[in-house]
Amino acid sequence: MSVSQPRWRFDGIAKVTGAAQYGADFSIERIAYGVPVLSKIAKGRIRSFDLRAAREISGLVEIITPSNALRLPNRGVHPEMKDAPQIAMLQDDLVHYNGQVIALVLAETLEAAQYMASLVKAEYHADTAECDFESKVSSAVPPKDGGNTSQYRRGDIEGAFSRSEVRVDEIYATPVQHHNPMEPHATVAHWQGDRLTLYEPSQWIVFVRTCIATWFGIPEANIRVLGPYVGGGFGGKGALWSHSPLAVMRPKCSDAP
């Protein structure tokens, strides 16, 4: 760190002038735009879809639901996370959480895809979701995965409290906060024969390649992940999110990139 001397970021000028090319900026001929449809319940099953209104809009390419989605050979995502619970998108009718991807609308323009996605309706068999942490913490199961110790104990807390002259017992809460980078999450997937190129805003492109290869049963040598710029990450671009495998899945279900 220098004092009174400017420090130039390697990518700073490109980002502040708009010259930086992010993942969603890469254009491919005949590209289709995908927008997910999200669940409105926290737990249960999907009974049925009503796609009629969405299908009436001009520019529709395809609507992917669990009934017509590409069957994935693997539900694991990464070898180091083999013991973690896996949720394979669009592979069954189960709903595990509110906001889960339950369908994908593809259209010739982004605006059309967004509008069509808003018209897709789903009916559910809703189950009771366990959302109260305090009442269920006693039955929590320690995670087995991740390669790190999940439970720590250090020192004698109760002993320290008993010896303290003053003890403050209070509950503090903070509002929900979200990292909001200049580059939103988006992925462009381009199939050329059996080779895949992903334009991906990622802080860990090797992880993305390994996950996609594992999930889809593709040799890693056939996958190229490109992320020349990352428009802010804050850790949110250090993992694999749903839009990436959905973009990879989509071209296998239709003939457009």
PLM regions and their residue ranges:
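Short, surface-exposed connector motifs at secondary-structure boundaries
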Residues: 33, 96-97, 190-197, 230-231, ...
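Phosphate/pyrophosphate-binding loops at sites that engage ATP/ADP/AMP, CoA/4′-phosphopantetheine
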Residues: 53, 209-225
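Short acidic, glycine/serine/threonine-rich loops at helix termini
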Residues: 73-78, 116-119, 201, 209-211, ...
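Thiamine diphosphate
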Residues: 233-254
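Flexible, low-hydrophobicity surface segments
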Residues: 1-146, 167, 243, 253
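Helix-loop-helix module between adjacent transmembrane segments
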Residues: 154-155, 194-196, 202, 230-238
